[in-house]
Amino acid sequence: MENIALVGMPSCGKTTMARLLSEKLNRVYYDTDKLIEEREGKIPEIFVNKGEKYFRDLETKVLKEVSKKTGIIIATGGGTPLREINRDLLLQNSLVIYLDRDIKNLETEGRPLSKNLETLEKMYGERNKIYQDISHIKIKVIEDEEKTLEKILEEIKNYENFSN
């Protein structure tokens, strides 16, 4: 059974949608950022104390572990798809869904790389193409979680190559 992996900007709703999809589809979900925090502490502290490269290495390590599983839902960190190895890991057995949320609705508090709207706009410009290139499905996130979930479920159902 294929995995479902959610990608997108920080705070676009990946963790929330992974949890809701998990409930609807009766699948276990893994949040790569949460797994990193359980092992290493808060992400902003990792960035300050050990640097972004150390964090990205942890991200790859955790993704390698979870992507060996099947039939799960993976909520990735916003920067996970930036590394080619991570893109390859996601694509090897996952239906990748890009959650595209309006930049003005993204949270900035507690996010080491997205401190304000200007930073988010720059980040979006750098990452949007990567997210689009890696994804099988793109969902425009709206503020109503249930409606967004319904859109995701409908797109999964309609995706011709997906084995549930």
Locations of regions flagged by a protein language model:
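NTP-dependent small-molecule kinase module
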Residues: 16, 20, 24, 69, ...
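ATP-dependent small-molecule kinase phosphotransfer cores
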Residues: 34-81, 85-91
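A glycine- and Lys/Arg-enriched "phosphate-lid" helix/loop adjacent to the NTP-binding pocket
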Residues: 93-130
